[in-house]
Amino acid sequence: MGSHSVEFSVLVLFLVSFLLGSTSAEKLCSDNDGDNGCFRSRVLAAQRADRVKELPGQPPVKFRQYAGYVTVNETHGRALFYWFFEATQNPSKKPVLLWLNGGPGCSSIGFGAAEELGPFFPQNSSQPKLKLNPYSWNKAANLLFLESPVGVGFSYTNTSRDIKQLGDTVTARDSYNFLVNWFKRFPQYKSHDFYIAGESYAGHYVPQLSELIYKENKIASKKDFINLKGLMIGNALLDDETDQKGMIEYAWDHAVISDALYEKVNKNCDFKQKLVTKECNDALDEYFDVYKILDMYSLYAPKCVPTSTNSSTSHSVAGNRPLPAFRSILRPRLISHNEGWRRMAAGYDPCASEYTEKYMNRKDVQEALHANVTNISYPWTHCSDTVSFWSDAPASMLPTLRTLVSAGLRVWVFSGDTDGRIPVTATRYSLKKLGLKIVQDWTPWYTKLQVGGWTVEYDGLMFVTVRGAGHQVPTFKPREALQLIHHFLGNKKLPTFPF
């Protein structure tokens, strides 16, 4: 039987099984079924075990969702946690999109799924309550979120020394093993076009995983082949030199730091060098101190602040967490665990992460998600304090991007233009350093009657700015972000005229 026939049979059996409901995998997998029959039964049982029927406080939806663990190293007992949402319409025809957040050490469930582009957002309520996101990316694709590496969120290892060996290489390999095994669990999606997207330190994760898939596909068996078509990264850490240079320049240009501090950093820091002098560190400490009173990740957004009756602060308050000054292994913004909050006119809630952590630590939520099966000894958090060591991180991802462009993969880079951590200035410097030929220079793109941002089309790469968005573009500009992913997946240019 051909692979497409097997996948079709699995999908049909899957649908029939839900109609029958009571049929067990053991009954379906009899001695007379043969290898294919038992394979279908095992797949069916695994999918049924991961099916999320309903979450506490969830509004009714018509799409299916799944969550659970996929083992990536049996010897060490390493398993990564995922959450998967079928597309709202025609999931059998839509691509599969994997979303990764950065850190390193931060959860794609907490940021990506629950606060940016997933279908459900936890709300501030005494009882569990989820709000349906009208701009969820599962309107465009079958949407997969992964907590990676182990030690992040609900992902775990039974070998404690694994935590001390984490780095870019291990993360890419484990994520690749996850995908190979996940597609075995969901073979009906194996022939679909597959894309990877992410933000921040996923500027490392996404290209490295894409390159590993590209290389492994050359030697992989048919059952392990991954149908990778492209990648998209936003406000991405790409190159140490240009990222640091652009970060300082953006802060000065946007009136965050003084002339004197700007000149002090430029005088004492050579961002081309790996070693940092004491004078440079001192200057950068002064620079990061400024962001204790501002949201570095969205320059014009309010911070989550404590009320006068509850002035206690959390270890995860961005303003109170030391900010690494060099080599940029920096966790995305964490929000205060305080009751006080303010809202922007557009509805952005700077304390959204507080609601997410409260929701994800509920026992009934974890049971519904088939999560925390090992009963981890610490609460679920957006960014893991367990991941405190990082063994390898290349100074530049530009060589990897060149490889992927040369391989013919679709590559898009986007940038929210109010992010101070990996600002649009830094990304523009990085792409200039990449050295690709410009096909169409600085061009406005539109979302209805308004300018959504600007594009630069390179030979093999598309650069898109998103006007008024911070580090987490889908959080601040959800409509524009959904438009962006639709056009990326459709391989279409963004509209250059109002509509």
Swiss-Prot record:
The organism of origin for this protein: Arabidopsis thaliana
Gene3D superfamilies: 3.40.50.11320, 6.10.250.940, alpha/beta hydrolase
Tissues/organs with expression: Ubiquitous.
Protein name: Serine carboxypeptidase-like 34
EC numbers, comma separated: 3.4.16.-
Keyword Signal: yes
GO BP field: proteolysis
Membership in a protein family: Belongs to the peptidase S10 family.
GO cellular component: extracellular region; plant-type vacuole
Purpose of the protein: Probable carboxypeptidase.
Position of the signal peptide: 1-25
Glycan attachment residues as annotated in the record: 73, 124, 158, 310, 372, 375
Compartment list: Secreted
Regions crossing the membrane: none
One Gene Ontology term of the molecular function aspect: serine-type carboxypeptidase activity
Active site: 200, 419, 471
